[in-house]
Structures are given as C-alpha cells and as structure tokens.
C-alpha cells in the first residue's frame, strides 16, 4: 500500500499534465454544434471557439493588421516585390508573350483587329481633340511651319523641265486663247475704256500726244471688244499667233525657272512666312479636327494594323532590343514608384480590404479544421510546452506524496 502512495500521485500528475493541452484544445472546440434537449440548448454546446467564431475572426484580423500587416510592413513588402530585377523580368515576360502572339498566325487576325480599333480611336477621336486644344496656343506649330518655309519653300526652285511643263500647262489649260479673249472682253468695260483713254491723253507726250488727243484709244478699244465678241474664233486665232510671235512659252519658262522667294526682299519674305503660319494655324483651328476625322474615316485601319504587325513580326531590331526595352521600362517604373509608392499603398490597402478577407477566411474554416491546425502547431512547434506540462504534473504529484507522508 505504501508503494502506491509513492508512485500513483507522480504518475497521475505526469499523465494529467502531459495531456492537459490536448484536452483543453478539444474542450475549446468540442462539440462542433449545439445540442438541444426538449428545445433547450445544453450549456457549453457548441464549444467556446465555434460559438464565438465570428467575433474571434474579427479579433484575429484586427490583430494581424495591427501588429503584422501594418502599412509600413506592406510598403516594405511591396518594395521587395517590385525590385528592378523582378520588374524587368516581368516586363520581359510580357514582351515575350506579345511577340509569341505576333508569331502565331491564328491570333494575328484578332490582334490586327484590336490594333486597328486602337489606331482608329487614336486618329479619329483622340488626335482631333488634341489638335483642337493645342491649336488655341499662339505658338502652335510655329517652329515646324517656319522650318518648312525656310528649308523647303525658300529653297524651292523649278528645274528647266518643270518650268517648261508648267508654262505649257498655263498656256494650254489655265490661259488658252479662249480664256484670254473672254478675260479681255470682261476687262474692256465702258468704264475701263474711258479710264484708259483719259490716262493715255494725260500721260502721252511728243507725237503720241497728237495721236492721243486727235484719235484717242476709246474707238480702238471699242472696236477690239466688238471684234472679240462678234468674231471669237478670229480673235482667238490672233491671240494664238500673238503668243507664238512673242515666244510666250519660252519667256514664261524663263520667268518660272528664275522664280524664287530668295529674290524677294527680306521684309517680304518675313511677311510671307508670317502669313503662311497664320493661315495654317487658322485653318487648323477651324477645320483641323474635322479634316483629321474625315481623313481617318477613309483609311483602312485593319490593313494598316496588319502592315504594322508584319513589320514588327519581322523586325530583328525589336527582338534583339527586348532586354534593353524591359530594362528601360523597369527603371522608369522604379523612379515612379520611389516617388508615389507610399501614396499608392495607402490607396491600395483600403481597396484590398485585407482585414475583411482574413475574417471571412477564418469564418469559412470549419471548427474541425481550426482544431486540427492548432493541434498540429502544438505538436510540431510547441512540444516543449507539452513536455513542460507533464513535468509540472509530475512535480505536483511528488509534492502531494510529501504532503501525504507528512
């Protein structure tokens, strides 16, 4: 009998202390659901944790967000995730996927349609609005227009062949004998004839004064106008012979060939440049958006997109430049994130709603799974506590033996 007094209390304390953690955890979770007798819920059913799982989930989420996933920690985590090397690798991967898509004939048509819609939207919608806004500025396109005038128009000079072709077009299409006759008739109005006759009488000197005051120009000009009206074919033949006699084609060719803005005075050139610039700016302000939109509607954007994709697909420079492009884009993103990452994280954290995500995840986990997870943590990571419980139970049993012996 004395032997059991020495052995039973320490062994009982050892067993109780060792298995107390498992029993306590089970008591926290068991039973998983409430039990009722005659409609009356039996106390302590369900267990403490299943009964208060929603409140516990909110407390866990609050603790994690307040102590572990603080804005500073999330900011540091984002910095680690968005290192330049990782961003460069991600951008390189995206570019590689895009190139693979370009190389795939099955997806080329779909890609071309998407690109065509993008190009059409940029040209038909975005570009007209941009031109409308920029055209309000006084210096809009001032530099390019001045450069165009100085480097193209100011240096423009017709070659001999071009001048010859232009002179022939003027004499045959723009100002043929028929047009010259009609212009001459339109010019010789009664009022103009009177004015010419008076000017001739006033300005004539010497023998011409005698002719001007005795005969005048009025009768001759009236006869010329009448002849042009009554004998159009004869008048046109005379005008054609006159143009040949004075060698109008050669003279006009020489004039056109020697025609250059450089021969004008500097003040006249500046005035022309200013007038050209103002004219283009006024036209773009009033008609630019409509002209661009109308031009965009006449373009086959899907064909343009196919040509662009074809050039990109066969571009060796693009393929060999992927690493450099990804590195440059990564550096641009890095500079942007260095400046705005903190403000971005402050905007992202409320959107992520991490505390609610954690609470929902805890609520969605069954009590049995929660119990199993905690038991696994205790067995793997907190075994020393279990052993300590057994040791304390053994020591308590020994103390009881001492009390019994005393």
UniProtKB/Swiss-Prot annotation:
InterPro entries: DUF445, UCP032178. Belongs to the UPF0754 family. It comes from Synechococcus sp. (strain JA-2-3B'a(2-13)) (Cyanobacteria bacterium Yellowstone B-Prime). The chain crosses the membrane at residues 1-21, 385-405. Keywords: Cell inner membrane, Cell membrane, Membrane, Transmembrane, Transmembrane helix. It comes from the Bacteria. GO terms for cellular component: plasma membrane. It is found in: Cell inner membrane. Its main location: membrane. It holds the Pfam family DUF445. It is a multi-pass membrane protein. This is UPF0754 membrane protein CYB_2931.
